């Protein structure tokens, strides 16, 4: 998919490079266009940490207990990446990364109002972390990132005056490849991601932006885009080399764990460029 996005981006740049005389001059947002965007991507940093299903009945929210009925995760949780095997070491924040997107769309002008549809492919490497600390001591970190996404959005905006400026809102559906990874300093138990660490998920997007139509049918602008995806994945903690008295094994022989925040919330702040046909 990454190669496809790169190819589409190259095609878009090639179209932009066409001589101005080969295209009809455009003075308003009305017709087909291709474009791209690049900017900073941020995954919302929650503080909920992890949650557990100790009897694997599908209901999360259980407390992992030791043989003395103490809370095995009493040291606490954080919404970041563990910096050591204990809560004292603390956590790093989620990783913000630069992402890019390519798109093709169509706008129709009705007086000062512009409405349209677009298809977009995007790539992002921003990472969301959720961590828990046990009394062992040991750390358990669940990482999630959006590898790539495909979206179909509508946009509606105002383009008053000479029609060379556009303020718009946008929203629609998205389908994303969510990458997951799990790391821990616990070397006794076994840990298995339920989906192998990679799964497609549906979500939605909403945002807004502004564009200016320059000469030679070129547009530039900026855009904010919010994306939200569901995530039902989890990690199964098995016995490994741990004794039967291990807290993860006491209530059914295994425990499932996952981020307490099941939603993935992403914010993108982009600079855009396009070419109007």
Model-derived segments and their meaning:
Residues 2-10, 14-277:
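Gram-negative outer-membrane beta-barrel domains
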